[in-house]
Regions:
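A SAM-dependent methyltransferase catalytic signature shared across enzymes that methylate proteins
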Residues: 173-191
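Short aromatic-enriched loop/helix-cap "lid" or pocket-rim segments at secondary-structure transitions
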Residues: 88-90, 153-158
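A short, conserved alpha-helix within the catalytic core of class I
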Residues: 122-133, 137
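Conserved N-terminal segment of class I S-adenosyl-L-methionine
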Residues: 1-108, 112-114, 128-132, 164-168, ...
Length: 225
């Protein structure tokens, strides 16, 4: 008898550990979420500081990993609207426009910049501008996501849910757009159905040393699978 699997993920049955994917214990399917890509790219990388952009009420992505496993010395969380309460005191809250971050933190001020669920809420021109800013802020790595499609029925569906006017969808992103500007993406995993199909995950090693050490090279580019 065949049918759609009611997935049971191994991470729900085992103690927490840094993972680069989760596997269904029933059908063997593999899925990778934002945290999995963070771990994949930074597990062997010394990281002392992280900037999370678009933090909102959910808090920084991979918070437990950064604080308790990587033991970062300083974290920054940036959001123009709201930031989760009761965060670990290691996180400094920056309630501000992310396009002004260079004025506050300065170039090469953090090891890693991450921005998930953020780019799609900027106009495309501002999205590219943010990517340039993030590259200036980071010493080692920038990793972001961008919505490929709307995650709801209308561009303002999130605004109607939580009242945050900045949650309007203003742009959509494709893997090729990142490849054209020299970034790597999750295309290989996306094509296999392992990534969330509504987003592209993209990253750039500002320090090329870590690109070589990660082993993630041209295989993550369209046409090089």
């Amino acid at each position: 008898m065949t049918g759609r699997c009611d997935h049971v993920w191994d991470r729900s049955l085992e103690p927490w550990r840094p993972r680069t994917f989760m596997r269904c214990v029933k059908c063997g399917a593999i899925r990778r979420d934002f945290e999995h890509y963070v771990v994949m790219l930074t597990l062997d990388m010394p990281v002392e500081s992280v900037l999370d952009v678009g933090t909102g009420n959910k808090g920084p992505v991979a918070e437990h990993y950064w604080v308790h496993y990587k033991r970062i010395k300083r974290g920054y969380v940036c959001d123009i609207w709201t930031i989760k309460e009761n965060l670990n005191p290691i996180w400094v809250k920056l309630k501000m426009n992310a396009l002004d971050l260079l004025d506050v933190l300065g170039p090469r001020s953090v090891d890693v910049v991450q921005a998930f669920g953020f780019l799609e809420h900027l106009e495309k021109e501002d999205g590219y501008r943010f990517l340039e800013i993030a590259e200036e802020l980071a010493r080692k790595l920038v990793i972001v996501s961008g919505a490929i499609t709307l995650h709801g029925p209308t561009p303002d569906y999130k605004v109607k849910i939580d009242g945050n006017p900045y949650h309007l969808y203003r742009s959509l992103w494709r893997h090729e757009e990142f490849h054209r500007i020299g970034w790597q993406t999750d295309w290989e995993y996306y094509a296999r159905g392992e990534s969330y199909m509504g987003d592209v995950i993209a990253w750039k090693f500002v320090d090329p040393t870590w690109r070589r050490k990660s082993g993630l090279g041209q295989a993550t580019r369209v046409g090089h699978l």
